[in-house]
Amino acid sequence: MIFQSFLLGNLVSLCMKIINSVVVVGLYYGFLTTFSIGPSYLFLLRALVMEEGTEKKVSATAGFITGQLMMFISIYYAPLHLALGRPHTITVLALPYLLFHFFWNNHKHFFDYGSTTRNSMRNLSIQCVFLNNLIFQLFNHFILPSSMLARLVNIYLFRCNNKILFVTSGFVGWLIGHILFMKWLGLVLVWIRQNHSIRPNKYIRSNKYLVLELRNSMARIFSILLFITCVYYLGRIPSPILTKKLKEASKTEERVESEEERDVEIETASEMKGTKQEQEGSTEEDPYPSPSLFSEEGWDPDKIYETEEIRVNGKDKIKDKFHSQLTETGYNNINTSNSPIYYYEDSYLNNNNTGNPENFKLQLLDKKNENKDLFWFQKPLVSLLFNYNRWNRPFRYIKNNRFEQAVRTEMSQYFFDTCKSDGKQRISFTYPPSLSTFWKMIKGRLPLLSLQKTLPNELDNQWVSTNKEKSNNLNKEFLNRLEVLDKESLSLDILETRTRLSNDDTKKEYVPKMYDPLLNGPYRGTIKKGFSPSIINNTSIENLKERVILNRIHTIFLPNTDYQEFEQKVDTVDKKPLSTEIDEFLTLINEFGNEPKSSLKVNSEKKTKFVKFLFNAIDPNGTKSVKKSIGIKEISKKIPRWSHKLITELEQQLGEFKEGVSLDHQIRSRKARRVVIFTTNMDSDDPEVKEEVALISYSQQSDFRRGIIKGSMRAQRRKTVIWKLFQANVHSPFFLDRITPPRLFSFDISELIKPIFRNWAGKEGEFEIIEFREEQPKREEKKETDKKGETKSKKEKARIAIAEAWDSILFAQIIRGSMLITQSILRKYILLPSLIIAKNLGRMLFLQLPEWSEDLEEWNREMHIKCTYNGVQLSETEFPKNWLRDGIQIKILFPFCLKPWHISKLYPSHEELMKKKKQKDDFCFLTVWGMEAELPFGSPRSRPSFFEPIFKELEKKNGKLKKKYFITLKVLKGKTKLFRRISKETKKWLIKSILFLKKIRKELSKIKLIVLFRFKEISESNETKKEKDSLISNQIINESFSQIESVNWPNSSLIETKMKDLTDRTSTIKNQIERITKEKKKVTPEIDISRNKTNNIKKFESTKNIFQILQRRNTRLIWKFHYFIKLFIQRLYINLFLSIINIPRINTQLFLESTNKLIDKYISNNEINQEKINNKKKIHFISTLKKSLYNISNKNSHIFFDLSYLSQAYVFYKLSQTQVINLSKFRSVLQYNRTSFFLKTKIKDYFRTLGIFHSELKHKKLQSYRINQWKNWLRRHYQYDLSQIRWSRLMPQKWRNRVNQSCMAQNKNINLNKWNSYENDQLIHYKKENDSELYSLSNQEDNFQKCYRYDLLSYKSINYKNKSDSFISRLPFQVNKNLEISYNSNTSKHNFFDMPGNLYINNYLRKGNILYIERNLDRKYFDWKIIHFSLRQKGDIEAWVKIDTNSNPNTKFGINNYQIIEKIDKKGLFYLTIHQNPENTQKNSKKVFFDWMGMNEKIFNRPIFNLEFWFFPEFVLLYNVYKIKPWIIPSKLLLLNLNTNENVSQNKNINKNQKQNFFLPSNKKIKNRIQEAKEPANQGERERGSDIENKVNPGPVLSKHQNDLEKDYAESDTKKSKKKKQYKSNTEAELDLFLKRYLLFQLKWNDDLNQRMIENIKVYCLLLRLINPTKISISSVQRGEMSLDIMLIQGNLTLTELMKKGILIIEPIRLSVKNNGQFIMYQTIGISLVHKSKHQTNQRYRDQRYVDKKNFDESILQPQTQRINTDKNHFDLLVPENILWSRRRRELRIRSFFNSLNWNGVDRNSVFCNETNVKNWSQFLDERKPLYKEKNELIKLKFFLWPNYRLEDLACMNRYWFDNNNGSRFSILRIHMYPRLKIN
């Protein structure tokens, strides 16, 4: 088995070796190059298909393979590469050859020479085939879009050592691929032929000879293909003669003649010219290759000077005065006849832009008279054909405001050269060009023997050995220091040895630290430059000529120096390379450079010695002679610039180009039209006197130009590809997938989701129906609005399309303009007057008064205004400039509308008023056909017709006549009906009267008495008779009527029937009514005693009967009366009793209601009074803490009687407030492992997840902490928490609620008297009233407060015993032992925003506990949504900050109540006031939460600035300033207004209401403020257990800023005195100054406002030209064209007024802060700094670090991953790396990594995270001493953060590598991860 595994391992290793070998890689890459198909394949394919005979086929393949072999060889062999790979050959040879081929061989049968008997090799056709394939293989062009495959070999060649082997294997690989390809091609051809010959019958007759035709037309097909490639390459490689020649910058062309003869001519001979031209001729696919400055194929030392000069502003007039030459007399290895001359040009003239006056130009010149006639013929030819400065390719011309010419894009940011890396010679792509240049110069001047190459193995071994030695030394030193620290000795052995530069070994004199190049950090000062501009200005030119300046390059040659500065200590760890050493060493000898030459001539031994040494450095023989002065040349990479100063078309139109630039534009801008809308001084011809106001309007079509330069080829552009025949918009190919998604993979997600939700929809059908009913009208409304929007957008699109069409057609504008003018003339002077005449004549015909005056008045009112193409009004008479070319619009104001009559204007009707409102914006644009359109090119609108009101009026009159007619008809009908009815009634009365008379007669005839009821019968019978009679009579009448009518009516039969039916119905209805009334009468019996009846008995009986009836009823009543009275009394009593009962209840209810009203009234009155008081005091004391928690009065104590109000959080909170109680009693609750009845289990789990339980509360055994557990822990540290902005993007709802709850103001919720009455709290009302996103419910608020108190209280009780030295509970700023919450001292980035709001931060407010301000410079996040900042609102907004420190009896502090923002409309934006309130400074004041009052006033919709309370009060001062530009203001300015050092007595002397202006105080205040600002950030020193703070002496922290501030204040004072008239108040001037000085911002206006402004401008243009503009201005205001609110009528408007009006909104520009370079470096590299108290022995160096603050404003570095602890414990030494300096620390890690074999530190560190290896710490931890309680957590945290996740090391590995400096670019990191530290 072992043997088998051994064999298997060998096989695997062998396979790996084979795969990684050069041969296999070459074969692979060569095989890939087969697929880069070029035109040579076309020739080969044609030879195989068409040529007869094997000789031609063989010759074709032979030529093809030979050409490819030559190409492979040319990769390695430089001369062949130069011959074949240069664009000269391609342009000169390839294109003519292609054209020749096309025209010569454009025949059906070509190469048909017939059979010859000669030798086949001598046959011309075979040779031609061979040559064709060979030459086409050499041509470097490809058909496929990417030429990457063909260049793979070239790319891999860089990495390969054995290049010849690689090239040959690559060629073999290509040959294999080619053979396979040819075989496959042959098989295809054979298959086609066989297919044609075997199955001819299957083809239809027309297609029978298709393949034969194809073979015959092959020649033509190939020639067409070749022609296409020829045209393609003609487009890609333009003809040099035909392209447009741009005019070069005139100043660049003007050179001194002698210089011109010898400056750039050398470029033509050098290879650099070739490489530059190669960029021009290279293919489109790779337009930005990266050539090295020095290619490998034979280096020419002259090339390095062959870049073009950069002249700033073209000022080189005084150049000749600085000319100086240094002739070199002889060298051993350089031919003296061709020795170059150094020409130095001192470019002091560019100091206005570059800022570096010693940036000298160095050029290589030839001798004056040599080679003068050599290149005279070459220059015009070469520059004509191959001028690399010409814009043949579509490069972008990227301008820079500081320089004139644009940078050439072909220059790579990478620089390739060989360097030592990991002990091997490798090609580095980030090699510093200066070093390369330097090394080439040294090579040219040193003998060849000294430059012998060492073998790579030797170098590797040497590197490994030195690295081992260095790492061993480091480890030894490190372990020695650990042992010393372990012994706790305070000897100097702990100190790290520093290598210093010494002047003299014997005396041990060192160079001052300021100039010591071997020291770094705060020891170093600024290095003074050679010259300052003031010296240059003061000294004359002659002195400058005579000045001797040391050239830094020459100091590298120091063979026999008399100065021994470079003698160093034996320890070579900090030894730097020579180049950087000399760069720093020259600061020593700058003093010699600053003296004129005359002083050097004095016989001073030292100085002559020095000059001797300098020139001995160049040649040991000392044969040099100084002819003229030498200028300093900073070796730097020259940037090639274009020699043209190009301007865009837009710049030409606007006239924004400088002098010396050609007037014609070279860059094509987007298609735009410059429309002049107003010109002053029209009469004068002088263009300088004329002032034009112009608008630039862009066309709506896509921009196909994209800043292309004239003469460059559009086809070569990569990012604007046109792939369709007609393409509307131009797109980059990169985004094509976004524009047109593929159809195959596109599917509707909603269709997939529907079946999933079908079941749910079935279950909840009812709800769906209800929702549908509710949502249906909404949907319909939405549909309607969408339809309207769609139609509107369609119309707009159509309008734009019409406009573009008119613009694109040739001569369209001329035709359109002339048509419009004719239409306007026709309308105004012909059409409308003729209509007016016709109308009035018609009125006269109809006998009406004519309306000549009214119509003519309206006709005169109509104005035809000439407008620009975009509708900007000019005037009636003035035409726009170039209107025939650019187009014109005619706008009709008050268009005339012909009316048939005019209504009197005295009393207009309501309808007329409504019409007027609609016609407010009554204007239109004239169309080509004389119609009216609302917008230019819009659809014509319908005009109101003339005849419509006439027809309406006629209809009205007709209607009135109809009404009158119908009314008369009605009256007549009614009268006839009444007559009929009267006649009927009279008839009835007559009949009745007759009957009655008959009855009387009968009765009189009778003597007998007639009984009553009998008479009734008779009457009934009579009635029946009556009915019969009436029926008969009716019938008779009807018959008679019908007879009479039937004579007159033509269709009498039908009408008769109808009439009969009607009469029958009416009669029957009448009879029925009469019968019913009579029956009712019969029901009540009548007592009819006739007068004739004389029977008295009857009378008596009737009366008796009546009496009896009455008596019966009376007895019943008397019988029931007793019960009735009884019941009545009972009811009465009950009602009385109920009313008596209800009276007090009603009264109490009324009383309660009245009292409630009174209370409410009283409260509101109090609030009003309170507001009045606040207004007087300028303090919005809207809500206060009436009583503190510990001072609850007896009156309020009844609130807490109910135990339900008590919660655990409240109990714990009360206990925490009492300072006497011992919280250790509650430790059992937290230590109890099972569930506890008192403390909720959630809290315990919460702390377990936090990882902050003490070792007592958990297992004694250390857990193995992996990354997941540490993630949980780190989430609770704010520096690892995301900002609110990021969280709100991730989880919008949950996190936003949480953040809003944590960020809400705490001023009211802390009062626990209202623990359960949050709903009534004003804060919530305020939040509801606010127009903000912070919707937080009262219950969530309540829960959050509870949660917070739970966490806080349990946290306190857990860490109670160990509070003195606990890790988490003790802050870096802790001065008091009552502070509980941990906060990291690294306050950069997001901490101010991520901090939970409800922190106990009163202990942060002390004098010394100000954060190190410089660290906050990198904050860039700013949550605008939370802060609600808007300058558009006005109002009186102040904030009152209550700060109550938890001070000790021995400390005295002054407390300031800061007023944040004053009234904006009165005082300006940033007016700060300070209220001194000495009452709050009580010695024994208890702990009060940090409280922010105010900001609750509602102004319009929302307050200007919603102050959140996470900021420290120190920063609150200038927070309103800081919020606009938090990354530009120096953060130290935030501390300028602090008065925390004032005593109470001083506070008492200051009036409470005294306001101190922040920006323009008196001089005394300035000095006080600056003095206050000088106070350094307190280092937090405090003895353990002491209650007295150590006072820190103020140091010069802000020396730099002090000067700036004094300047600012002085400037503002002078500005104030100068500009008193311009500003209404001081604050406006202050604000102006402040914004200019400290802030960089852009003023933005809304889009809506922008549109309104443009409309206003259009109206202004018209009004300026009118003689009497009042009429038009009033009408335009009425129509809404001109908005008065944004009209700026005042002369001088300040910024504040503009912002108040809402016109301008301040928007910050995000810029990077220009930080101090040292500060960035130490912020990036510097790990933590151990506190002073631990390194008292290190004072010699450390004190220097604290005191030297001249350049480094304060050199104390705040820690990034650890805390500063004020006690003398050794926490920071748990991480051993903290002993070393940062540079040595990184060096130690990297060197230990190079030597390590096992890498296991990627996920976790085995030593520091394993329980078993904990004892390995004994080297630096004393096991005898007990660990502190929290030391385990600390160790885990630090060892987790140390080795695995040190990001600053990985990011800056390349930038700040130890012992070298290789530029600022990040290269590929070769360090994966450094392993654990080995302790032997």
From Swiss-Prot:
Q: How does it sit in the membrane?
A: Multi-pass membrane protein
Describe its partners and assembly state: Part of the Tic complex.
**One Pfam family in the UniProt entry:** Ycf1
What is noted besides the main data?
A: There is a partial copy of the N-terminus (positions 1-489) of ycf1 in the inverted repeat (CAC88092).
- PANTHER family for this protein: PROTEIN TIC 214 (PTHR33163:SF40), PROTEIN TIC 214-RELATED (PTHR33163)
Choose one Gene Ontology CC annotation of this protein and give it: chloroplast inner membrane
UniProt biased composition (Basic and acidic residues): 1572-1590, 1601-1615
Organism, by scientific name, is Atropa belladonna (Belladonna)
Listed A to Z, the keywords are:
Chloroplast, Membrane, Plastid, Plastid inner membrane, Protein transport, Transmembrane, Transmembrane helix, Transport
Query: Can you say what this protein is called?
Result: Protein TIC 214
Lineage top rank: taxon: Eukaryota
| A GO BP entry | protein transport
List, alphabetically, the InterPro entries matched. TIC214 (IPR008896)
